[in-house]
A protein has these predicted regions:
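Conserved C-terminal "lid"/linker of ANL adenylate-forming enzymes
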Residues: 20-26, 36, 57-105
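AMP-binding/adenylate-forming catalytic core of the ANL superfamily
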Residues: 1-65
Length: 105
């Protein structure tokens, strides 16, 4: 079934070294791959992402709906709507995630 951002993201946002996450779909409608984009908290080095990703997978495995999220990508800083700084630019993030996956990131 479908995954909803408001059900998925809070599960991962509790991680102390994560600033925020954004669930995006990559691929053709109906056959989309769930990708969780992860923005690390201030001061957290990108080199720590492999460990953080493992911990996020463990968090996700505790819930049936988040266990299905298999792809995690570190993003340096989410694009946001200029008018509403907190509103994440999900379309841009989805395009970025698709490009990362094409490059075999």
């Amino acid at each position: 079934g479908p995954l909803y951002t408001e059900q998925v993201e809070p599960v991962f946002n509790v991680h102390p070294q994560v600033r925020r996450t954004a669930l995006v779909g990559v691929g053709a409608a109906g056959a989309q791959r769930a990708v969780l984009c992860v923005e690390l908290a201030a001061g957290v080095h990108a080199g720590e992402f492999a460990r953080i990703e493992r911990e996020l997978r463990q968090l996700g495995a505790r819930h049936p709906h988040t266990a299905r999220v298999a792809t995690f990508l570190r993003h340096p800083g989410f694009p946001v709507d200029i008018r509403h700084n907190a509103k994440i630019g999900r379309e841009k993030l989805a395009a970025w995630a698709a490009a990362q996956l094409r490059q075999g990131q």
